C-alpha cells in the first residue's frame, strides 16, 4: 500500500488594513436643483477612492522587498531615454528565466507594467504592439507566459541597492519605478465588509444636509517571501548620454 501523507495546515491570524473616506456633504437644495443624482455620484466616487487605495497598497505589498534568489529584482537593459534605460522584451525573458529556475508556477503568472514600461514596449517592440490588445476578449494578450496588466502606481526601488521604497514615501532622485511580477497562487487576500456611515438631512434641521462616508478592511500579502519579482528602470546619469 502507498504511504499515507498528512497535510499540515492551520489558521493564521492576519490584521487587515483599514480604509475609510471622509464624509461628503450633500444638501437637500442640491438634490432638488441638480439634474443628476448627486448622491449616487458621491457614493461611486467614495468606492473608487477606496479601491484605488487598496490596489496601491496591494501591489506594493506583493512586490519584493529587495533582490534575492527567491525574489529577483532586475534592471532594465534597453537604450537610454530621459534619464533611464527603457524596458525591452529581453528584460521580461530574463525575469521569466529566473521564475522558471525558482519553479514559480507557470499557470497564471502576472506582470503588472508601470506606465513607462508600457510605453517602452509599445514604442520599441512591434510584436508587443501588434498583440497588445485582444479586441475579442477586451484584454491585453499574454507575453512570454505572463498575464499582462497596467498600473500607474507601481512601487519604486532604489536603482542602486534594488531595495523597495517604503509605502507612502516620496521617491528620491535615486529611486525608479518598477513593473511587478508574481504568481497569484502564492499570494493571499482578504476583504472585510463595507460599512456605510450616513446621516440624512431630515435629521439635521439646522443644516438640512446629508453626510455620507464609507469604511472597509482589506489586505493582500505574499504567503511566503517567494514567487515575486520586479523589473526596475535602470537610472542613466547625464554623463552616459541621453540619446532620445
Regions found by a protein language model. Name each.
Residues 1-4, 46:
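Short, polar loop/linker segments at the starts of domains and inter-domain junctions
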Residues 9-71, 100-115, 148, 197-198, ...:
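Long, contiguous amphipathic alpha-helices that act as assembly "spine/axial" helices in icosahedral shell
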Residues 68-139:
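Extended, solvent-exposed, turn-rich assembly/linker loops in the middle of proteins
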Residues 58, 91-94, 207, 227:
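Exposed alpha-helical structural elements
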Residues 3, 7-16, 80-87, 124-244:
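Sequence/fold signature of self-assembling virion shell proteins
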Residues 28-30, 38, 56, 60, ...:
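General "foldedness" signal
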Amino acid at each position: 500500500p502507498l504511504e499515507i501523507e498528512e497535510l499540515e495546515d492551520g489558521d493564521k491570524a492576519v490584521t487587515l488594513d483599514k480604509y475609510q473616506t471622509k464624509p461628503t456633504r450633500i444638501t437637500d437644495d442640491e438634490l432638488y436643483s441638480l439634474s443628476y443624482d448627486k448622491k449616487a455620484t458621491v457614493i461611486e466616487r467614495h468606492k473608487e477612492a477606496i479601491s484605488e487605495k487598496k490596489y496601491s497598497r496591494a501591489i506594493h505589498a506583493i512586490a519584493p522587498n529587495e533582490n534575492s534568489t527567491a525574489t529577483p529584482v532586475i534592471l532594465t537593459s534597453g537604450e537610454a531615454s530621459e534619464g533611464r534605460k527603457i524596458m525591452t522584451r529581453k528584460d521580461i525573458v530574463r525575469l521569466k528565466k529566473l521564475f522558471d529556475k525558482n519553479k514559480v508556477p507557470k499557470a497564471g503568472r502576472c506582470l503588472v507594467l508601470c506606465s513607462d514600461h508600457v510605453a517602452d514596449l509599445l514604442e520599441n517592440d512591434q510584436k508587443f504592439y501588434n498583440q497588445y490588445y485582444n479586441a475579442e476578449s477586451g484584454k491585453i494578450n499574454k507575453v512570454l507566459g505572463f498575464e499582462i496588466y497596467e498600473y500607474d502606481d507601481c512601487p519604486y526601488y532604489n536603482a542602486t541597492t534594488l531595495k523597495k521604497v517604503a509605502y507612502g514615501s516620496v521617491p528620491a532622485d535615486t529611486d525608479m519605478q518598477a513593473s511587478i511580477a508574481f504568481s497569484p497562487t502564492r499570494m493571499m487576500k482578504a476583504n472585510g465588509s463595507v460599512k456605510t456611515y450616513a446621516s440624512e438631512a431630515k435629521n439635521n434641521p439646522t443644516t438640512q444636509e446629508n453626510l455620507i462616508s464609507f469604511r472597509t478592511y482589506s489586505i493582500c500579502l505574499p504567503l511566503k517571501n517567494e514567487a515575486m519579482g520586479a523589473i526596475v528602470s535602470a537610472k542613466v546619469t547625464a554623463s552616459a548620454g541621453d540619446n532620445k
